[in-house]
Design a protein with these regions (language model features):
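Conserved NTPase motor "head" modules and their coupling/switch loops across ABC/AAA+ ATPases, GTPases
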Residues: 28-145
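Flexible interhelical turns and helix-capping residues at alpha-helix boundaries
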Residues: 2-5, 23-26, 47, 51
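Amphipathic alpha-helical coiled-coil segments with heptad-repeat character
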Residues: 5, 9, 26, 30-33
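Extended, charged alpha-helical "arm/stalk" segments used for dimerization and assembly
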Residues: 1-22
Length: 145
């Protein structure tokens, strides 16, 4: 799986780089922008699928490891895919077109993904002490093997 993900990520990075270069130009080639956008969308979706599966597996391990530490509370790992999950990436990028051109970059996609960690329903950064954050980091590292 790791090799497949790495190859996929490289293809995604190439498409993102090409799309962003087009967005930065004052006069852009619309056909090229459409082509790189069409390449970027399925790659983003495939990367998202890989990551969701990885996080689901990791979450099980993290919960098992974190359960050995006192005082961490109820952990929840949430995956943010880099765009509103109620919309397709195609819809989001179409809606972002003006903003993307103005900023010269692609504002949504797999490159904007994040993992949000909550403890007892509150962001871990707001809830945990520095010592508890260290325990959480240890749990994450141990869970990854």
């Amino acid at each position: 799986m790791e090799h497949g993900y790495t190859a996929l990520w490289r293809r995604f990075q190439k498409a993102l780089k090409q799309r962003n270069q087009l967005l930065r130009h004052g006069r852009m080639d619309e056909d090229s922008l459409r082509a790189w956008t069409a390449e970027l969308i399925p790659l983003s979706e495939q990367i998202t699928d890989f990551r969701k599966q990885y996080l689901a597996d990791l979450t099980k391990q993290v919960l098992a490891v974190a359960g050995r530490f006192d005082g961490l509370g109820v952990l929840e790992l949430e995956y943010y895919q880099g765009w509103d999950d109620q919309l397709s990436l195609e819809e989001v990028l179409a809606g972002d077109r003006t903003r993307d051109i103005a900023t010269g970059k692609t504002n949504h996609g797999a490159h904007k993904a994040d993992i949000r960690i909550n403890v007892d329903g509150v962001a871990a950064a707001e809830r945990l002490s520095r010592g508890q954050v260290k325990l959480l980091v240890y749990a994450l590292k141990l869970a990854q093997g």
